[in-house]
UniProtKB/Swiss-Prot annotation:
Residues 252-456 are annotated as: N-acetyltransferase. Its EC number is 2.7.7.23, 2.3.1.157. Pathway: Nucleotide-sugar biosynthesis; UDP-N-acetyl-alpha-D-glucosamine biosynthesis; N-acetyl-alpha-D-glucosamine 1-phosphate from alpha-D-glucosamine 6-phosphate (route II): step 2/2; Nucleotide-sugar biosynthesis; UDP-N-acetyl-alpha-D-glucosamine biosynthesis; UDP-N-acetyl-alpha-D-glucosamine from N-acetyl-alpha-D-glucosamine 1-phosphate: step 1/1; Bacterial outer membrane biogenesis; LPS lipid A biosynthesis. This is Bifunctional protein GlmU. Acetyl-CoA binds at residues 386-387, 423, 440. Mg(2+) binds at residues 103, 228. It comes from Bacillus velezensis (strain DSM 23117 / BGSC 10A6 / LMG 26770 / FZB42). It comes from the Bacteria. In the N-terminal section; belongs to the N-acetylglucosamine-1-phosphate uridyltransferase family. In the C-terminal section; belongs to the transferase hexapeptide repeat family.
Amino acid sequence: MDKRFAVILAAGKGTRMKSKLYKVLHPVCGKPMVEHVADEALKLSLAKLVTIVGHGAEDVKKQLGQKSDYALQAEQLGTAHAVKQAKPFLHGEKGVTIVICGDTPLLTAETMEAMLNEHTDKGAKATVLTAVADDPAGYGRIIRSEDGAVQKIVEHKDASEQERLVKEINTGTYCFDNEALFRVIEQVSNENAQGEYYLPDVIEILKDEGETVAAYQTGNFQETLGVNDRVALSQAEMYMKERINKRHMQNGVTLIDPMNTYISPDARIGQDTVIYPGTVLKGQAEIGDECVIGPHTEIEDSSIGSRTVIKQSVVNRSKVGNDVNIGPFAHIRPDSAIGNEVKIGNFVEIKKTQFGDRSKASHLSYIGDAEVGTDVNLGCGSITVNYDGKKKYLTKIEDGAFIGCNSNLVAPVTVGEGAYVAAGSTVTEDVPGEALAIARARQVNKEDYVKNIHKK
């Protein structure tokens, strides 16, 4: 197989987005558009990926990192000019180069693979990905000869009235023989209505040289959607959400209301899990088998075990075990690890805490910067007092300990194995194992106190 290369065009400013955020960094289902494009392209076993950057270059580099090399297009002088900036990386290489727009987040590796196969089968020097649009206004048109071969591609602004009637459009995705591309691109001129160097002109030059030019028509116009404004962004979001949700349902996940369920492209969900409306799964969220998630639950970059129930709660950058019950209205903050068969109840906040198997915090508690052992019971209103205004300190609660209601554990402090803390205590010193800690004022009852104050 020939070497494969890809060039992502991501240098446009995107003024129609009316945003301070660089266009290709606008997220679709929680993931920047350009990263959708890069991840799909990388599935094609590329020898090299080059992203053309301009406005917001550093932000794009930060987002894609080591996935790509980068070439700067300092002035936006057209698509051919943009591709030309990749010449230092690709000039002289033998193989096939795919050119993709960074604002086409719905384009799949499967479609690009089909285009590459068409390119190879036809022995073409260039192949364009086309689609049929009900309303082709604004798109370049594919002009074919009588025998059906691609004759040229005409930009909308340069098209004649007759050419504008054509509904087969240029999607802006191409593949080229790499050596032919960088030879011919030097011949492209800017003699057109926009005064720009158009990449489709490479097709016409190759055609004039007698080279074979092919076209692969995808049957899915939605997949080729280019995002240029917030309306198109919302359409891309809708189409991507439908695609993601359909894939999970086909893999054995029940979505009670797919229209109101939001799942990241990179999320993984096990079979027989049920997702209720209002659930948002972000980033690298991973859900096990037979879970119940939602309604109104947000899980981000977290791993959830099997048979776990999470209702009306938030889990962020944490790990949750099997057979756990969380919520309603619980918050698992970053760097927490929740064991198996745990209960985290209503209005409980866990932060940077190791929470052992079968332990419980059922109501109205804050457990932060703590190590909680197995079989621990934290009563209603249990608080780890972890911050002195300058520094956070660790609280250790060992296996089998029992913390009574409305107790404050002032860190750094350790409650030993099997120890009890009496309700209402403020514990400032370590509690030995099997001991009872009582740290509260002794109750005093003053007889007839109320009667006497009313006499005054």
